[in-house]
Amino acid sequence: NQDIDKFCMIGISKNKVVALFSNTMNSCESNGIKLGDVESKVKSEHKLLDYRRIKNTRYILNEKYYNLIKTKSSYITVFYDSFEDNKVVGIQIIGKKTEENMAEIYTSDESVTTSFENINRYLINEERSRRGLNMLSYDENATLCARAHSKDMRDQDYFSHTNLKNQSPFDRMIQYGINYQGAAENIAAGQTSAIFAHYALMNSEGHRVNILGNYRYIGVGVVFGGSSSMYLTQNFYR
């Protein structure tokens, strides 16, 4: 993914491609669904699942920013942009066996943390690049600040920009040595991957404004566990 305008991710298991995601290129494996299609077209042409089953547990699908479709060989997740006429903006394809053999819907592997954070940053910069905006540079202090807040939300079991010490995002950024002219914070919890977290935020007006805002630096911090299973914080500043 050196060329961010041709962004895609490929999942490989036992030397075989078992998963694919892209928000810039169409795939012949997407059952005819293409980027730019409208939600009504997808719904009229495909049968949508209303739950996702992992082992013996059913997870109800009640979010409006994506649909899940089952084909003979795969599960296709179609992501929409509610601020751009509900057009398809991302397509994830997971092989049927891979999806159905998953042990759990949430990861508990802390080694995945950095990948989750990196993917989230890549997705943000692709959104910005596509709109002619500057890409955000990785910032270590902002990343540490974001991770600390995600960890605190998990450990103290709350979900808020203001922590239990009554510190705002801006208080925390200053504490981590960030000198800013403008800053913002996004938080998310409960999503099963960096992709789902990204589109949840992009379909929320205030969070979207931050992602596409006038900033230069970003830090993303993710932790797993707790009552929401995953906590994500994004710190932006200039």
Protein language model features and the residues they cover:
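Short, low-complexity, polar/charged sequence segments that are solvent-exposed and flexible
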Residues: V38-K41, K97-E99, D109-T114, D155-Q156, ...
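Short, well-ordered surface patches within globular domains
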Residues: V112-D171, N214-I218
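Acidic, serine/threonine- and glycine-rich low-complexity intrinsically disordered segments
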Residues: Y65, S82-E84, G90-M102, E110-R130, ...
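Second-shell loop/turn segments in exported
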Residues: N26-I33, I105-S115, S129-D139, D155-S160, ...
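Short, surface-exposed glycine/acidic/tryptophan-bearing loops
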Residues: D3-C8, S13-M25, R147-Q191
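A well-ordered secondary-structure block
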Residues: F21-Y75, P169-R238
